[in-house]
Amino acid sequence: MLGVNYGVSFSNMYFSPSKYNLSPVFSTDYVSITYTKHSKMFGSIPNFALVLGLATGTEGFSFSENPETGYTDNYDDVQQCRIRVIEAPAMMQFHADADPFKFMANAGVYGGWRQSISRSGPQLSKEWTDSFRDYEKRLDYGFQGGLGFALVFAPVELHFNCTVRWSWSSLNEPDYDSKYYYKYAYPLDIMATAGLHFHLTKRRGKTNRELKKEAYEIVYGKKN
């Protein structure tokens, strides 16, 4: 099955040491193409699939003003940041069908590349508003998974998904500022998408009688 998905994202950053008054960055540019291969686990459980894809979207963070002090925090003089990324997720999917609905749970990993960056802050040098520093990592990878449901009208499916993307690649080298006090910045994003998926081969389910027969043969073997 081949699908095209479009959606919005809410991007934030996990900082260590901690930062405060963070606000999510809202973007409307998430697009992905996915290929789904349905298969049986252990040769007998039909509720699984492999999902491979190619996607582009946004990572980032933003600091809001502290209402009590009027101070706005920053990270390396940056108060707002958007990073354009391209990624390739690979996930296992568990799905349960209840015609015409399909309920899905996905979990896996992704690898990607931070293509470009746009950031701002009153103390930020103009040199770094749209370029990466030497100690900032552009290779991206991590966990990706989520929940969703679909409306199935063979040979077309309409998918709605909520996905979490948690990067395991810090935005910067941890010891860039000090060899004794490490700093980390891990992107954490939530995407809400809608997609149109097309069956590449004819979709055929099994009747209850066929499923019972298959289960019987697994337990007791085929009749002579």
Predicted segments, located by residue:
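Outer-membrane beta-barrel channels and translocator barrels
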Residues: 36-45, 97-101, 152-156, 199-203
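Residues on the lipid-exposed face of transmembrane beta-strands in outer-membrane beta-barrel proteins
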Residues: 4-8, 31-37, 54-56, 88-96, ...
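Extracellular/periplasm-exposed beta-strand and loop segments of Gram-negative cell-envelope proteins
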Residues: 11-26, 59-85, 112-140, 144, ...
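Predominantly the C-terminal beta-signal and adjacent terminal strand-loop region
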Residues: 140, 145-224
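Early exported N-terminus immediately downstream of N-terminal targeting peptides
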Residues: 47-61
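Short connector loops at helix/strand junctions that flank enzyme active sites
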Residues: 26-30, 45-49, 83-89, 100-104, ...
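Short glycine/proline- and aromatic-enriched beta-strand/turn motifs that initiate or cap beta-hairpins
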Residues: 1-40, 197-199, 220-224
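Outer-envelope beta-barrel architecture signal
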Residues: 1-2, 44-50, 99-105, 154-158, ...
